[in-house]
């Protein structure tokens, strides 16, 4: 199955990746800043601790460690995350498509994983959206099962897919650099 990003011309892919990466970093910075009040001894990873709490008792402990303002910041962070998930998933998806293209051109291993992993990034964003819904439900309606369990399940899938996409993108980037270096060496040996 083709990915929509495969239709983007190569030169435009580079520009699009740069823009998406810069937006991802900017939003990550803003969300980390918003998340500072969420870091407590009970929730050392802030919102991520909340995502992975996994049961009602742990969620109650985390919510009790946050004052009213921290809970408002958590809500703001979860709302902003809906924009963030569109940006980060598209950035990593495009990087996966580009990595697959680069690996195919160099005849390295696993070029065909680029497209499925690109789709996987948008799947990660869907899991992120469900996770956020579960967390927003908890913040607005109270702590009830199965919402903490749903959040942890979705966060686990999300982070796994993101990690696979980032590792594959790095692999493709290393392959691209190696191929570029090899071409330079060939050009130098044939003046």
Role assignments for model-derived ranges:
Residues 2-77:
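Interfacial loop at the N-terminal end of multi-pass membrane proteins
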Residues 4-12, 65-68, 72-75, 105-115, ...:
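Juxtamembrane loop-transmembrane helix junctions in multi-pass integral membrane proteins
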Residues 14-21, 107-123:
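Interfacial segments of alpha-helical transmembrane regions
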Residues 27-33, 66, 76, 152-160, ...:
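Multi-pass alpha-helical transmembrane bundle typical of ion/small-solute transporters
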Residues 76-99, 166:
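Hydrophobic alpha-helical transmembrane segments
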Residues 96-104, 174-178:
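Structural signal for the C-terminal ends of transmembrane alpha-helices
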Residues 119-174:
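Alpha-helical transmembrane segments of multi-pass integral membrane proteins
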Residues 179-191:
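Short, highly charged, low-complexity non-transmembrane loops/tails of multi-pass membrane proteins
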């Amino acid at each position: 199955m083709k990915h929509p990003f495969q239709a983007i011309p190569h030169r435009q892919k580079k520009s699009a990746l740069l823009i998406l990466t810069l937006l991802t970093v900017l939003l990550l910075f803003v969300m980390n800043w918003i998340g500072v009040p969420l870091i407590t001894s009970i929730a050392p990873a802030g919102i991520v601790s909340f995502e992975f709490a996994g049961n009602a008792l742990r969620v109650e402990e985390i919510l009790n460690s946050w004052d009213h303002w921290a809970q408002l910041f958590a809500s703001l962070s979860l709302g902003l995350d809906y924009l963030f998930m569109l940006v980060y998933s598209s950035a990593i998806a495009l990087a996966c498509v580009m990595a697959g293209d680069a690996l195919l051109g160099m005849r390295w291993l696993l070029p065909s994983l680029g497209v499925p992993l690109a789709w996987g990034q948008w799947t990660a964003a869907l899991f992120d959206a469900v996770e956020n819904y579960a967390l927003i439900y908890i913040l607005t309606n109270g702590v009830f099962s199965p919402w903490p369990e749903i959040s942890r399940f979705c966060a686990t899938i999300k982070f796994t897919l993101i990690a696979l996409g980032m590792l594959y993108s790095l692999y493709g980037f290393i392959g691209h650099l190696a191929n570029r270096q090899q071409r330079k060496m060939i050009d130098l040996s044939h003046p």
